[in-house]
């Protein structure tokens, strides 16, 4: 099976944020954290890999040492739509950005690899625009037709010979 569609939230200010890696052996990056191999869910759960389509969430947080999410303004939540979505910052302050990648396509009896998780906190100014691309799950492999990868870079299901089927 292959990887799912990537999810991301982006603007020019995003760099050096915490990255999570599902089932990674090691990493040299100072901010890389590992997601537990046993922690994956079909719902968006912090620090867990995601089954199915991807997801994204933007939350305003307090400027205190706790960085707790607060309810005003309400968190913006983004499900998979198959296209890039836009968010306009409604209040200047610190925001927590969370994204979950989509699951890859499957090839019976194996399920596609689950999507990863990433988060970061960033200061944003009212009126700034963020662009959100939530990954789509890769389609299952069938013997009759080649499957398609998910939206935003997702992998297709099935095992193929790369030299005879370049992507």
Identify the function of each model-found stretch:
Residues 2-54:
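C-terminal, surface-exposed recognition/capping segments
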Residues 3-4, 52-54, 83, 93, ...:
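Residues that flank catalytic or metal-binding motifs in active/ligand-binding sites
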Residues 14, 61-65, 101-105, 135-141:
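Acidic glycine-/aspartate-rich tracts in secreted/extracellular proteins
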Residues 35, 41, 56-58, 95-99, ...:
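Extracellular beta-strand-rich recognition modules
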Residues 50-64:
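Short, structured beta-strand segments at or near domain termini in extracellular proteins/domains
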Residues 57, 66-106:
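GGW-centered surface loops in extracellular recognition modules
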Residues 101-119:
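Histidine- and aromatic-enriched segments that form or immediately flank copper-ligand environments
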Residues 114-167:
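Secretome/extracellular-domain signature
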């Amino acid at each position: 099976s292959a990887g799912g569609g990537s999810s991301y939230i982006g603007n020019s200010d995003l760099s050096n944020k915490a990255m999570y890696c599902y089932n990674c052996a090691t990493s040299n990056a100072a901010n890389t954290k590992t997601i537990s191999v046993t922690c994956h869910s079909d719902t968006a759960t912090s620090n867990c890999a995601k089954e199915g389509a991807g997801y994204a969430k933007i939350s305003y947080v307090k400027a205190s040492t706790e960085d707790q999410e607060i309810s005003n303004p309400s968190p913006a939540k983004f499900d998979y739509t198959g296209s890039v979505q836009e968010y306009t910052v409604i209040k200047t302050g610190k925001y927590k950005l969370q994204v979950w990648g989509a699951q890859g396509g499957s090839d019976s009896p194996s399920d596609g690899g689950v999507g990863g998780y990433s988060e970061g906190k960033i200061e944003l100014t009212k009126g700034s625009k963020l662009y959100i691309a939530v990954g789509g799950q890769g389609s299952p492999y069938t013997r009759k037709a080649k499957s398609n990868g998910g939206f935003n870079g997702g992998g297709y299901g099935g095992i193929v010979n790369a030299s005879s089927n370049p992507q």
